[in-house]
Amino acid sequence: MIFRSRRVKAGLSSYVFRWSGGMIPYKIQRGLPEEMHQMLHQAMSIIEDHTCINFIEKTTEKNYVYMSYSEQGCFSHVGMVNRGRQKLNLGRGCWKFGTIVHELIHSIGFSHEHQRNDRDSYITIAYENVEEGKEHNFKLDREMGLEFSTYEIPYNYASVMHYGSMAFSDEDDEPTIIPKKLSEVSPKQVYYSAVDGDGRPVIGLRKLTWGDVRMINLMYKDHC
């Protein structure tokens, strides 16, 4: 989830919101159990191992990511907001490896895959099934007021940044995101790792994919 003060997988186009040198200072909330520390470090490590990004413990840096636990849910600012401490929160139910990676990639500078401006060619948003008040989670990037680039990477159904089909579903428990059948799109225009019985790519996966890695490295190409 994107922190609501800047709701904006596409990467920020402006260099203003990128972390200098691909270095992201961070600080972890005091008092977190060792298991939580390990999960955070493992998630940061997998990103570092495959991209140009480096997470460094905060010393004197003004801008940094504060990794915290509270009951408020899973959210992060997108990119470097240049306001000093910026929060990445992992609440109850958020302590899953893929979810942590998802939020870390928000902090790097990426929105959701299903909010790309070209998403309507690949998925259908069933707004009639979305929980009241949660519609903003499905807005296109351009509706957020900031510019994003896809870096000419094909639509990635398997992206760790793609919501699942039941995201923010109302009490009727019907899908909110419906992938188009592969027969309706060109396989050369998309990435996917699995297909369901109806011939639709599976979404909502929580593993870092080649497409995610490629997007990050293109955004921070000056530091690769």
Label every PLM stretch briefly.
Residues 1-224:
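Zinc-dependent metalloendopeptidases
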